[in-house]
Amino acid sequence: MQEDLIIQKNLFAIGNDNNKQKEKTKIPEDLSLEDLKKESQKRPRQRKNSTNLINKFKTDLISNKKNVCINEESYSYKTVSKLKLTPVMKHYVTLKEENKDRLLLYRLGDFFECFFEDAVLISNLLEITLTSKDAGKEIGKIPMAGVPHHAMDRYCADLIKKNYSVVICDQLEKSSGNYGTPIKRGITRIITPGTVIEEGMLIAKKNNWITAIYLSEENSNESYEWGISKADVSTGELITLEGQSLSKLFDEIIKLDSSEIIVGSNAVRNLLIKGNSQITYTVSQETNFGINEANYLIKNYFQIANLEGIGLKNLKNATRSLGGLLNYLEKINPSNLDKDSSVKISLDFPQIQYGHNKLIIDYQTQKNLEIKNTQRENNYVGSLLWSIDRTYTCMGARCLRRWIDSPLLNVNEIYKRQNIITNFFESKKLRTDTQNLLRAMGDLERLAGRACAGHASPRDLIAIAEGLKKLPRLKSIIELFKYDLPNWTDQLINIDEGLLELADTISFKLVENPPLSISEGGMIHDGVDNILDGLRNLMDDYSEWLNKEELKERKISKISNLKIQFHKNFGYYISINKSKVNLAPQHWIKRQTLTNEERYITSEIKNKENKIFQIKSRASSKEYEIFCELRNIVAEKTKQIRSIAKSIASLDALLGLSITSIENNFIKPLLIPINDSMTKNSTKIIAGRNPIVEQLLSDKKFVANDISFEDNQKLIILTGPNASGKSCFIRQLGLIQILAQIGSFVPANNAEIKIADRIFTRIGAVDDQSSGQSTFMVEMSETASILNQATSNSLVLLDEIGRGTSTFDGLSIAWSVSEYLAKKIQCNTIFATHYHELNYLKNSNKNIQNFQVLVEQNDDQLIFSHRIVRGGSNKSYGIEAAKLAGVPKEVIEKAKSVLNSLEENNKLNHNIK
């Protein structure tokens, strides 16, 4: 209300002494709309152009300041003359020139400031005030915006989330107190979206990938060779792969889900943007992707004699991409900024990702099956991952996400995962004991990474120690497991004694609840260091002296409630109530007057204060030194900690899958290996259910359905009305296939599942405006990709083909595609369609079988049973579905009339050969 009143006063001069003058220009109330139109034509108003922040800054500066030099060069570090700048601004511009594509935060006193274009940008991004700073007599005012130094991490997190990289220039020494003496400043951190390790800048249950892409210089789209290397510097994971053709590269890039993608030139970036304009690429022209440089960097980083030992001997493009990634990380690594620093980015040996050892799920299939996010809203809730994730640690959640991205092909490895789920499934005590151990466990992968990078806090180290102390109890649980177990369980049974000793060392040196700040002391236990203990003894002596001094001054002044207190700005002082001022002795020196309090100092207190500060400073420095030594010890164990953390993560993921199985009545499937010549069995699922839809149906029971590809009947033609459940059914098979191949139990009463080498989906289609492709062309491109890449071991899920063209063209294409899949490729396929003519394919091809969604019609009312039964449907019930959707009755009646006419005059010949 107060704000409204102020606005009214300003606009209408309410309560203003000038009201009498305003009355002279009072607007007549009887003006008609025509009068106002004539007035506007008589004196037309000119449109005012909107101004950007820089122009607004100039306008405000000119209107509010006199004698200010306004030049275009004042607003850009690129055009400003360094010779005209103050020493501080000259240093800022020099650093900015070296970091053109990053925001530079420059420490000045208690603030980190930005200038020139960066100031305008961050004032907009962070919604902070844009102000100005004097850059020298000849330059005048320049734009400035800043954030408090204590809140810098929070603001950096906001910038990182908006995909900006940040350079931190901090003060490297304390102010000498001499005005005019420059303070030494330098770059202490470079933070990019792909290299953050701070907890507040990361998504706990998701990897934070930074990716480097090498692209060969070829002309043909299909002859382009490429290499990709991606790393999560917070967990140490490193994956590399290579391939051929731009189409495959574009698909891999979309699947990467990277926070930052590095390429070596604008030409490469421009080429990749054609594949997907929604992805941002960082062009690092100084990054070297040369093969010789890559060989040197990789061998030097991993301390190996050759590349053969890590599987890169014959993978030149993968090697180039990994070399480029390491080259980029080296340039932004803090250890390169400070040669004496012991910190580094620690990465594991690269995992070589081959197409032949994992189930391939391309981006389109991930999207269609809603594996990690829903298709329409891109939400986590409603995805496959949401439906099965019952993990207790962030490590386990990330592990499960990786498994879903790359399910296994090796049946023996899958069975070993199943065995752990079975152990948990059969024993509530094993589940409960493991849950209790994992529930409060910290993120050991990322905690170790922060220690290695020199950013771990005392609380981080305590969390590492607490996690490592649980290893013996985890060992006792694993030893109770039956059946054949994965190799990674060996680490949990044969525990590295060095890790247990490390946990004891951390607990011995650090207090249980250390402070957040590492510069103010209070984090190291007594008895850890003789020098620190000696300093603390002296501190105790001075504390005792202060207590005695307080009693002495009370006695002298006869003020019983007198206190000696401490303030960070004033130091130690005597505090008395204002009513006792008349009792203050003459040797007291007045320091500060407050509303109800007077503060004094004495020469004795001041003398002791200096000594107390010196001892406190030495003690804090000693604690910091001890802590840094301890952090370095932890950093040396980073690889061992991360290795055991990955085993814990796998255990957590399987524990979560066991809980999902119990909650949702999943069963253990029997798996049929690829190319199993001993059996002709194929996928057979009894009472299968869609794991996502079933959990979303809170008040309804999901209708389970069977499916079988036995007796070489590889292709199922599925017909039925719209909204009857066809799409749900074909997605259900894809989801069950993925669950089975990550080692999970599946939603069914019984299941035999043949291992698939790849899942293809063609479900729905929209036009692709970025590439200029129509809906039909997108549909045909996806179909062509399936026909050209599917093998007899693939799983193909089709939901309509040929809808975007004429009926005869569409039917012809659908017919031909079906025959090609059944006769030539012979892979397990479900084809949901409204072309009922395709049911006749069964008559001429023994590999094809017909199924339909059962529906009942009561007068004009459709009743969906969602039951899948053998046999083909001969009616789509499209008009009935339109009626259910609320289409006007007049339109429905007309549609019925047209349909009857078409059926009479355009009967199709079903004897197509």
From Swiss-Prot:
It comes from the Bacteria. Residues 18-50 are annotated as: Disordered. Residues 19-42 have a biased composition (Basic and acidic residues). GO terms for cellular component: cytosol. SMART domains: MUTSac (SM00534), MUTSd (SM00533). SUPFAM superfamilies: DNA repair protein MutS, domain I, DNA repair protein MutS, domain II, DNA repair protein MutS, domain III, P-loop containing nucleoside triphosphate hydrolases. One of its GO terms (biological process) is mismatch repair. ATP binds at residues 720-727. Pfam families: MutS_I, MutS_II, MutS_III, MutS_IV, MutS_V. Keywords: ATP-binding, DNA damage, DNA repair, DNA-binding, Nucleotide-binding. Belongs to the DNA mismatch repair MutS family. PANTHER family: DNA MISMATCH REPAIR PROTEIN MSH1, MITOCHONDRIAL (PTHR11361:SF34), DNA MISMATCH REPAIR PROTEIN MUTS FAMILY MEMBER (PTHR11361). This protein is involved in the repair of mismatches in DNA. It is possible that it carries out the mismatch recognition step. This protein has a weak ATPase activity. This is DNA mismatch repair protein MutS. The gene is mutS.
